[in-house]
Swiss-Prot record:
Record keywords: Cytoplasm
CDD domains from the UniProt entry: YvcK_like
Single Gene Ontology MF annotation: LPPG:FO 2-phospho-L-lactate transferase activity
Name under which the protein is recorded: Putative gluconeogenesis factor
Annotated organism of origin: Deinococcus radiodurans (strain ATCC 13939 / DSM 20539 / JCM 16871 / CCUG 27074 / LMG 4051 / NBRC 15346 / NCIMB 9279 / VKM B-1422 / R1)
Length: 467
């Protein structure tokens, strides 16, 4: 797979000293010309109104001329024309040229006044006039992007959303809400609500404002009752309490946060994640998995209470999706729990959209120890009832120092073993790793998914091969 396109050159960089004197005075004019040209880009819905304005102005001018020449203003119109005639010069500047100059000045004045009115209105709404065309162009372009539903939770999902929002605004994140530890667990127990932590991360990832994203993720380091909580978690808890539930508060949340896309909990009912192990034991509560699973392994996970309902908005998004992405994230605690909602699982099974599983880079200590990629896919198939159409796996090498750091915590690189040849035709390799980490690069991952959406790749890769 080809790497994502290089970023555009920094046009704000200073020009060479040799021509700086010539370039500097023209910069404002060049920037204005570029902005003016952008208003004429296809898809903005502006050119039709410019055309209508020109036509109406011409018709209005002709009608006004007819009115003044045939109506009670005829004497005044005659004096006006005679006054203009004094500026004419036969053979050099004829009468019709005088009229054209006056008409051009009048049109320029009208356009200037409309521009200033628009700028004043934009400033009143908090939008910088200089960036209005860029914002409009970006939103129009993103509104035509892929309709994608992402399923999961944790850092993996928020990373994915960070990359996807640069390609589309038609994003629906379906977030697992079974966490029972940390700030989420405390709020869940105190207010009988779903865990808000992963929802907060997704809202921050889709936020158009970096300042708002930082605010949502701010974690209080002191204060009785506040220490350990993030502002975003408290905001979601407040809206859930005020509106009588998180489900009814979702529209308010989206309007307040102005995110690029939609974020929904997999269910609005507080649920507990239960793991059934190979040795017959049962563990209740996600926060206990890592410590209590070993030396056994997970056979199946389920929710208590069973058969929680899903939001209507989630089911509609799945039905309308052009791609459904599972992960990246923890297999048994982030991805599969959302697929245990019967309505969501049924909608995904019946959807004509391709289902893409973004494989983790490392195993989860105590959760997926010793599992290969084919084991991951089999677990998804077993719980969902549908095998992913695509499996996206990174072929970038994790730096040895990073691997050693993870190995000290009990994590190893996820591999595609011999049994993985059963996945032939489904696996797609791409360089997805963020340099110096064992995490997916948001932009590389989004670019790989967009390539899958644009059309099936010409060939697939198996271990040992490279794109």
């Amino acid at each position: 797979m080809s790497a994502p396109p290089a970023p555009p050159p920094d046009r704000s960089a200073p020009p060479d000293r040799t021509d700086s004197a010539q370039t500097e005075p023209t910069r404002p004019l060049v920037r204005r010309a570029r902005r003016a040209r952008m208003w004429l880009e296809p898809g903005l819905g502006v050119k039709r109104w410019i055309f209508l304005f020109v036509v109406c102005t011409f018709v209005g001018a002709v009608a006004f001329l007819h009115f003044t020449w045939t109506g009670p203003l005829h004497p005044l119109a005659t004096k006006w024309i005679l006054w203009l005639n004094q500026f004419a010069e036969p053979g050099v500047f004829p009468l019709y040229a005088v009229g054209m100059v006056v008409m051009a000045l009048a049109l320029a004045g009208a356009l200037y006044s409309i521009t200033m009115i628009s700028r004043a209105m934009l400033r009143g709404t908090g939008t910088a006039p200089e960036t209005a065309v860029n914002v409009l162009y970006e939103r129009k372009t993103l509104s035509r992007g892929m309709r994608v539903v992402t399923v999961g939770g944790g850092t993996g999902l928020s990373n994915l959303l960070t990359g996807l929002k640069t390609h589309s605004s038609n994003i629906t994140a379906v977030v697992t809400v079974a966490d029972d530890g940390g700030s989420s667990g405390r709020l869940r127990e105190a207010l009988d609500m779903v865990a808000p932590g992963d929802l907060t991360d997704c809202y921050a990832a889709l936020s158009e404002s970096p300042a708002l994203a930082r605010l949502l993720l701010h974690r209080f380091g002191r204060g009785e009752g506040l220490e350990g909580h993030t502002f975003g978690n408290l905001l979601l808890a407040t809206l859930s309490e005020e509106r009588g539930g998180l489900g009814t508060a979702m529209q308010d949340i989206h309007e307040i946060l102005k995110v690029r896309g939609r974020v929904y909990p997999a269910t609005t009912r507080p649920v507990t994640l239960v793991a059934e192990l190979a040795d017959g034991r049962t563990i209740r509560g996600e926060s206990r998995f890592a410590e209590q699973i070993r030396p056994s392994r997970i056979e199946r996970v389920r929710l208590e209470p069973e058969n929680p309902s899903a939001l209507t908005q989630v089911l509609e998004a799945v039905r309308d999706a052009e791609m459904i992405v599972l992960g990246p994230g923890s297999l048994f605690t982030s991805i599969i729990p959302a697929l245990l909602i019967p309505d969501i699982a049924r909608a995904v099974r019946e959807s004509p959209a391709p289902v893409v599983y973004v494989a983790s880079l490392m195993t989860e200590p105590g959760e997926t120890d010793g599992l290969s990629l084919s084991d991951h896919v089999n677990a998804i198939t077993r719980h969902l009832g549908r095998t992913p159409d695509w499996v996206l796996l990174s072929n970038s090498k994790i730096e040895p120092a990073v691997q050693r750091r993870y190995q000290q915590e009990g994590a190893t690189v996820l591999t595609l073993d011999g049994a993985g040849r059963d996945l032939r035709g489904r696996v797609r390799f791409a360089p997805l790793i963020q340099a110096g980490t064992a995490r997916h690069d948001p932009q590389k991952l989004a670019a790989a998914l967009m390539q899958l959406w644009d059309g099936p790749p010409r060939r697939f890769s198996l271990p040992g091969q490279r794109d």
